[in-house]
Structure formats: structure tokens, C-alpha cells
Amino acid sequence: MERIETWKEKIEKRLNEILKPEGPEELIEAMKYYPLQKGKRIRPLFTVAVASALGGNEDDAITVGSGIELIHNYSLIHDDLPCMDNDVWRRGLPTCHIKFGEAMALLAGDALLTYTFEVLSQRENYKTLSCEEILEINKIIAQKAGSNGMVGGQVLDIKGYEDLYEVSVKKTGALFEACFMCGAVVAKRREKLKEMESIGRKVGLLFQMVDDYLDKDGFYEKLGECLKEEIKKLYEELKEKEIFKESQELRYLLDLIYKRIT
């Protein structure tokens, strides 16, 4: 879809614009290693699509979505570490700790996380948002990425917590909640926050279920091929939500997730 591709190009450009931290050269190189690789950018695209559907400024949504993408990439750096998933390849390239060393990768993730909030908190990076709205966006992202969100979900995962729904809602769904909620804040539609939080959670759950089906782990280990039917039910439920009916771009992004298994 042409509009999605345009947004994606703008997200790539914005990531390059905002990712200019200062510090030791090797640390900066490690911080940039994941975010500047070409990716799906599904999270910032959802942020922009929600903001657009609700009447928000697309440039501001691109800035916020790019920040969420940086948070996502910091989490990937840490997830790949030997003490977590111990992965050696990501996107066809050596993982951050393989290329830069374990200690540098750990520090790069830390620095990327803190730098993201430095960028997102600067008024000059936005066109239409008030200081109050910027503060709210930072609070939402901090909560959804933190101990009761993405990081908390990772803890449940490495501890072998059996409730896959709760693990997935926190580990994957929380950051999608942030995408949808921040889209509403950008659009100055705070009355939509609870609704967007709920929809974002379900989109994140759909994303995780599709991943598990393709990787044959997680939900697939519990449900087997029945998982495909559960995915279809959740997809059909989301399609009936008003915001998906009204936004061609949101439907397209939802289809991108679902069609990976069809």
C-alpha cells in the first residue's frame, strides 16, 4: 500500500535523524546496530496509522513511533544476550553481543533505552503536542516497557511461567498497547485511551500467536494446529472493531500479521 510505504520511508528517515547520541564511538555504533537495520517497522506503523485514523498529526506520530521502535530494539539487544535467549543471528546478521561483545551489547541496550526518553521528552521534536501530551506519551511508554509490561513479561518467560496469555500480553502486547495509546494521545483523543489499550493488547497477542505458530513453540506447543483457528478468531474479532473498519491502513497492517500463516 502506497501510504504505508510512504510512512515507512519517513520512519526510516526519522530514525536516522533522531538516533544521534554522543559518547564512546564503539557504544554509539552498537546502539545504532539494530535500529538502523531494515525491519518491518510494524510498531511505529501502527502508531502512525492509529494517530492518522483519529485525526492526529502524522509527523508527530512518526516521531513517537520511531521512539517506540528504539525501545523495541533495545529489548532485542537484551533478549539476544547469552543470559537470555543466547541468539547469535538476527535479521541474517550477527547479534549485537556477537559483533560487539556481551558487555558492550548490555551497555548499548541500556544507553538506547535512556536515549529514547531523552529524544521523546524534547518539545522541539514535535509540531503539535503540548508539554502535557509529551509527558503522557513518555509515561505510557515507560509503563508499557517496564516492570509490569514488556520487562515483566520477559521475567515471566525466563521463569517458565505457564500462563502463556499473561506472558504474551506483557512481553509482546504491552508495547503494542503503547503504540495504540500514543496514537490516541497524538490525535488529542484521550477519551480513546482505554479502547486503544485493549485493541493494542489484542493486536500484540495476535502477533505473538502468529509467531508461535510459525516457530512451532509457545502457544503452538499448547494448542497444536488448533492455534490456527484461535488466530483466525482473534483476527476476525479485530476486523470488526470500528477503528479497523474506518482505516484502510490499519486493516492492511492487521492483514500483514495474519497473512503470514495463510
From Swiss-Prot:
Its EC number is 2.5.1.10. Isopentenyl diphosphate binds at K40, R43, H72, R91. Gene3D superfamilies: Farnesyl Diphosphate Synthase. Mg(2+) 2 binds at D79, D85. Keywords: Cytoplasm, Isoprene biosynthesis, Magnesium, Metal-binding, Transferase. Its cofactor is Mg(2+). This is Farnesyl diphosphate synthase. It comes from Aquifex aeolicus (strain VF5). The lineage of its organism: Bacteria, Pseudomonadati, Aquificota, Aquificia, Aquificales.
